[in-house]
Amino acid sequence: VKLLVDGFTTKITRADQELRVLVYPSAIDLSSDHLRHLAGRLAARRREIGTRWRRITPGRQALLVLAHLRCGDTYAQLAAGFGIGVATVYRYVREAIEVLATLAPSLAQVMRTASRLAFVILDGTLLPIDRIAADTRYYSGKHKRHGMNVQVLTDPFGRLLWASPALPGSTHDLTAARTHGIIEALAAAELKCWADKAYQGAGCPVRVPFRGRRLKRWQRRHNSTHAKIRCLGEQAMATLKGWRLLRKLRCSTNRITDVVKAVLVLHHATA
């Protein structure tokens, strides 16, 4: 493990680890409901698989996982803070994410819930990832960076309803929406949807603003009203990015979908 101590990168050995690693108390901007919800799920998981003993309790494991997801703390930092090994931290985090991901609602379930709403808002976001320039599949020309494309549905007040599986960043928003079956699900539910210009050509259920520079007055007024409604969907993006791990993901791209689902479940647990 390499840590930055007094401006120098130092390799930590077992013999001098206690002398060089500093641990301090900190806070997580989450409610105790998040902690109780996750701890309860982890305790149930341990009973299910017949776990007899572990280094830390379900409550401490839940706290560790929340620190990782919400604050973006690394495995090495968490290992030092909780007095366990880095490999153990990795296993605990992965287990918790898998447990939460299985609880995430499907698109069909969300459509049934949203059928009572006047409309929903659809938008796409790019979750930045740690990739080299050669990985063109993950490079978004729109955002000029590498990342994963995630589609988000919100209610009319901007509350997060659903987040899609993650696709490579080069995927266009409309292509992603069609890949996930969002357009077909909206049409089947006869649910109105507001979206930006990236979804031009999506069809009847999706309402988009007019394109072009020489628009008539009524078209400009329509676009202005459309933007005021659509901007509420940005609150959902802020909700996702409030979990600092999603601001720069360094894990395998195959695990990002489960991470997003885990965040969604934690958000719904206390919403």
What are these regions (language model features)?
Residues 55-58, 143:
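Short, solvent-exposed segments of well-ordered alpha helices
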Residues 50, 59-61, 221-222:
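A short, structure-level motif marking secondary-structure boundaries and short turns
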Residues 57-71:
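Short, amphipathic alpha-helical "recognition" segments used to contact nucleic acids or chromatin
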Residues 77-94, 98-271:
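Short, well-ordered secondary-structure "scaffold" segments embedded in the functional core
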Residues 1-53, 201:
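Charged, often Cys/His-bearing segments associated with DNA-binding zinc-finger transcription factors
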Residues 31, 57, 216-218:
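Ser/Thr-centered flexible coil motifs
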